[in-house]
Amino acid sequence: MTTKYITMNIKLSYHWAAAALLAIATGCSNDNITPETKPDSGKPETTQVSFIAGNEGTRTSLNYDKEDFYWEDGDRIFVEDDDHTFHASSNAVSGSKVSHFKFMMPGKYTANDYIVYYPGKNGTNNQVTISANQTQTEPDNTLHFGTSGDCGTGKATRQTNGQYTFKLNHSATYLCFKPTFDHPLASTYVTKIEVTADQPIAGSYTLGTDGKLTGTGSSTTITLNLKGTGSYAKGFPMQNDATAKKCAAGRMFMVMMPGKYKLTVKYYVTDTETQVSGVITKKFPAFEYGANDYYDIPSALNIKYYGDDYYTWDAKKDYWYGHKNDQPKEMGIPGSNYPTSADADRWFNPAKFPAKASHTAKDCPNVNEIMWYCKKGDPHWDDTTLWTVWQHLYTGGMWFKKASVIAKENGEANAAALKSKSPDGKDRTSKGEFETPPNNTSITQKVPDDRSKYFFLPAIGYYAAGKLTDFGGHGRYWTSTPYPYDKNISYNLYFHAHDVVVSNGSDRWNGYRLWTSE
């Protein structure tokens, strides 16, 4: 058996890892041999023939790191005897991680060799069921293989003492997932993994004498439920590493019918503190998944991370600079040491129109650009895409068309051309317009079909007098343009689920987000 590592950079490829699982004979050479199970003394040896699974063969569970395989509690084998009758072993494995076992077989056996069938714990004879609903109760554990569809065959050969020995070769495919994220997360769990193929990957199959599975199957989707007891009752936790800069869950394993498939993998995650759940989807092109092989599926969770810096308009430093411990991370909680006019670094820039921002907001879009985003950006409200700040999961935000897309669709030379004038032809950066805040209430309530043409802004709220406000439901993003008619106001992009506004009524001392044109 080998482990194959699958990587994806638009197109899927794989390579053999130098340290991958080698032939199991090598992986099992260091197994400790447990005492053989003896037949009942009251049963004649002529009716109970020994079929011994030696330490040189594969078993039915895996220690992934040590590359050791074991038989597990309740495992039985089946053999078709001289009378063409299938028999189950009269005994089953007792205990866990058993490396060597003597199965006692009723029936008539006079030939030199026989095919041994292991159809899994839910199978009989040579009939196998690869389950469409599999459950793993703790990370890095494969005890569920037997009930999920693990199966195999082996050639049992008669020895001089009349016993038969065999090596089990597995017939299913095994997928390995290890979800990771490049920032720390708290109270976040992976609750299930769902794999969907372009043809059936689970159902009822027949084990052939050649060890191959045949049959059409019945389900194109396999769900791996990740739930146990104790610390795993809510799912498998994303654990922060020693540096507290990233996190990972343990390995998760799925049994699948071998074949060539296009796979869609969905990771279901939940944050038990914020009560936010979501799905992260990855698609893989057609690939041949072989029998008796493990495949490491790329499992980096694509969750957008946002920092927690907010700013008064064009301040030199962020709103909570030097006072991060005072920054509220929940709404309604007042924070002390928020900016005042006495703090030159955190207080807003008093520049007057038509001057532009010269500090932290200098690279933000100007008022002309946000007019384009508002009126021509085809805004889409999205309450499903996950994003994270403060080690927790959240949803809520707006998609806008990229400036380059807007320019092309509206006959402008390029994205930079949007800086010089608004959609109505007026340049609001050089001449003031006293007007009701322009807005757009035509908001599509879903993720854009072609996200490559759009960019996303989270509804990450703002700070007013030290209080976090409208978090998760509203977004406020500064521009580089002061408002012409009030020295304490600057333009900003404001949105919620049903409206996008070119806001001209926001005080500069509020803590809003910075951003750049896409």
Give the ranges of each region predicted by the language model.
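Sec-type signal peptide cleavage vicinity
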Residues: 2-384, 394-399
